[in-house]
Every structure is written in C-alpha cells, then in structure tokens.
Amino acid sequence: MALKITVIGTGYLGATHAAAMAELGFEVLGLDVVPEKIEMLQRGEVPMYEPGLEELLRKHVAGIEGSTGRLRFTMDWAEAGAFGDVHFVCVNTPQKHGEYACDMSYVDSAFESLAPHLHGPALVVGKSTVPVGSAARLAERLAELAPAGEDAELAWNPEFLREGFAVNDTLHPDRIVVGVRSERAEKLLREVYVTPVAEGSPFVVTDFPTAELVKTSANSFLATKISFINAMAEVCEAADGDVAKLAEAIGHDERIGKKFLRAGIGFGGGCLPKDIRAFMARAGELGADQALTFLREVDTINMRRRGQMVEMAREALGGGSFLGKRVAVLGATFKPDSDDVRDSPALNVAGQIHLQGGQVTVYDPKGMANARRLFPTLGYADTATQAVRGADVVLHLTEWREFRELDPAVLGEAVTSRVLLDGRNALDPEVWRRAGWTYRAMGRPTA
C-alpha cells in the first residue's frame, strides 16, 4: 500500500515539499494554522514567489480542474494525524529576538499538536534547521505524547533548498541526508525518496546529531566562502587589484571551485545569517565555542559590506551629506528569483541612506509588496526606468536578470548623473562605461 504523507507547515519549505511529494506520486495532506494561507493553497495559489511552484501546485491540488487531486490542505491536527504514515515537519526556526540562538517554539508547538493524534505506527520527520541535540529531545517528547508510544518514531532529514530553485532542489536533490535510529525509519525514507535515489541522488544515512550538523555546517561553509571573497575585495581595493579576476583565477582550482566567489554587499535572507549565529550560540552551550569563533568574523565581514556600500554612495555624491540627493536602488530581495526580503542587504543599504536624508527610490521585479511592508517610508517605482528618473547615483544591489539586460544608454537619459555602483559585481563595466557611465564596484579598479 502506497505511503500517505502529511506536511506540517506550508510556508516556503512546506509548500514546496508538499507539491513535490505529490509530484512523486504520493497522496499528500498539508497542514497549517493560518486560514488565509490554507485558502490560497486550496485555490492553487502560492503565498510567496518561487519559480515553478504555483504550476506544480495547480497540477496536484484537489478540486482544481485537470489536477491529479493528490494534494489537499487542512487545519485539523486530528485529520493530519490519522492521514499520514510519514509526517514532515517544515515549520520556521527564526532567530530569537535580541539573541543569536534559534527560536524552537514553532517546532515544539508542531510536535505538541501532532503527537497526541498519532494512534498507530508513524514516522515524524523533521526538516527544519535546528540546533544540534534538538532531535534527541524531540524524540523523547514524541514518545511521551503519542498514544502509539515508541511506534511513533522520529527521523531528521534536513532541507537543502535554494530559493529560486526550490522545486528542482526537492525533486532532484544533490544529496538526501537522513538521521535515523531504526531500520524501519530508514526503510520508510528510502521509500519516500525512491525516485530521486534511482535518478542518482546520494542517500546518506547517519545519526541525529550528524544530520542536524550537516545543514548548519553547509550553510556556515557557504557563508565563510562569501565573506572570504568579500575580505579579498577589501584587500584588492587597498592594493588596486581586481577581485573579479582574482575570483576567476582561484575558481579554476578544482579544490576551491567558482561558486559563491562573487564579491559584493554580502549575503542575507532567512537562512545563512540566522543559521551561523544559532550555530555559534549552540556551540557555546556545548562548550565548543572556540571551534566556531571564526564565524563571528564571517558575520562581521558580511555586515560590514552593507556599510561600505553606503560609504561608496556617499563618495560618489561628493563625500558629503545625502540630504537632497536622489538615490535609485535596483533590487529589494536578498537574492534574485525570489520575493524574500528578510535581512535583505539591498533594503538595509536603502534604509541606511534614507535615514541619513537621501531620497531613495527602490525597484524590484518581485519583491515590491514585501519591501513596502517592511520599509514603508522608502520610495518605490514600478519600473527600473521610473526608479532612476532624476537620480544622482544608481545602486545595483540584487542581481536580477532584468537588471543585467538593461540598456545603459536608455537608462542614462533618465538620470541626473550617470553614476552606477554595482553592489553585486554582476554587470559588464565596459558596456556601462561606453554608454557614458561612471562604473564602480566593490574590489574593482575605478577605471
């Protein structure tokens, strides 16, 4: 008999996972406690922008004409408990307010709500990013609360999704990591992931703490690589070097690789910043704080880049005050192909300049609604051309394809001064300079 799957939490991770499980052929029930979110999903609408996700949802959501009907949604914990053989917990784990540590309240609440409705054998699978040691604690709590007792097992299966590529990353993962305590749990998860494993995705079986550490270790490594190249950009600026050529050269070394070597204003979003901080906090609790002290410098370098972009803008305007100066910001999301503005370096820079008196106008292809909610006092435009109209300086802060394809000559007709600061090192300097622009980027020669 085919497995039935529930997905607890239908945000970015949960909605993607639920749709992907339906695509893999399973009957899926998604649960959330927010009525508006459930109503949207039942209509086949996605509460966030993620390429390909809405199409996948509409292909499977019950009640939509032509769908497979394999995917339904509910707010009823009892229904979810009775429905699923495997329950994936995909709720958020934000940073605690005023602390580095991870806020586990959503995860704890999900377990407390689901467990009393598990009356028969079930596997609860955590996918959220949690501090190491959480799975062992949750396994004990699950056994205490579930009527099924020890027949309600726990496994940990960290997610490795990239916003903008989430559907592909779920259906065709570059690895599947499972932390289990029994052969039964491993067998069930192999059954869940039989299709991607058959297509060549590695299936790594380990224990709870290692599975938990894999996710935070991966994010910490990526954050370190980004901050490393940004540190090299600072050295290049001091030595009149070119960080883009430096990155190209060291990227040819197969031990290093080319990815995550583009210097700029640093990383943001809802994962990397809070994950490395929570990792440091947990290491301190375990008495291993010295092992991760380097991550504090990784975080410091990353945050410093935002301030450096503000200073570059000030210098481009003559080195004085921002008062009365018009600043156009291209980009609001923390990365392209997403509408996520959480801890966005672009909005952080825009906000700093606004607070210092600059007249800031922002444009982003997908992040405008979220940006307006987070920074209502900034100015916003409906197009890039509108955003730069009358600008004294233009800041390119999110590397959307739309911005890479802009015509510098056309844009130049709208601005007061043809000055471009490329905060992502993603535009072609020569194309912009030939169109009469002064082009500057972090870690690059000024001419």
Where are these regions (language model features)?
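Structural/interface elements that position substrates and couple domains in central-metabolism enzymes
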Residues: 1-447
